[in-house]
């Protein structure tokens, strides 16, 4: 896993942003999602972790929707910085 790249980003985020901001929360959820994904590659039948992953994905999706409504520029920057796909519009 690419932990070192995220450590430098998280230290910048902690200095610049509030920990309660939507951007910081999306960043933390993304780290948790990546950790759980690598865990589930080894433990495929860990259904509680799968449920936790789905819950975190939903939370991140709601936060990203909120951020895209409030500030489109910061939303685009965050998605490109974290290398997240943009959700499909229904």
Curated annotation (Swiss-Prot):
MF annotations from Gene Ontology: structural constituent of ribosome
Keywords: Chloroplast, Plastid, Ribonucleoprotein, Ribosomal protein
Main location: plastid
Compartments where located: Plastid, Chloroplast
PROSITE patterns associated with the record: RIBOSOMAL_S15
Pfam families documented for this protein: Ribosomal_S15
Entries under InterPro entries matching the protein: Ribosomal_uS15 (IPR000589), Ribosomal_uS15_bac-type (IPR005290), uS15_NS1_RNA-bd_sf (IPR009068)
GO (cellular component) term, any one: ribonucleoprotein complex
Highest taxon listed in the record's lineage: Eukaryota
Biological-process GO terms, alphabetical: translation
Family: Belongs to the universal ribosomal protein uS15 family.
Subunit structure: Part of the 30S ribosomal subunit.
Protein name per Swiss-Prot or TrEMBL: Small ribosomal subunit protein uS15c
Organism, scientific name: Platanus occidentalis
Organism phylogeny: Eukaryota, Viridiplantae, Streptophyta, Embryophyta, Tracheophyta
């Amino acid at each position: 896993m690419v932990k070192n790249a995220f450590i430098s980003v998280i230290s910048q985020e902690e200095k610049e942003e509030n920990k309660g901001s939507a951007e910081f929360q999306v960043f933390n959820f993304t780290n948790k999602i990546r950790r759980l994904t690598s865990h589930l590659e080894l433990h495929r039948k860990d259904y509680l972790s799968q449920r936790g992953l789905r819950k975190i994905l939903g939370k991140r999706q709601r936060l990203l929707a909120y951020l895209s409504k409030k500030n489109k520029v910061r939303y685009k920057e965050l998605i490109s910085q974290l290398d997240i796909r943009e959700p499909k519009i229904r």
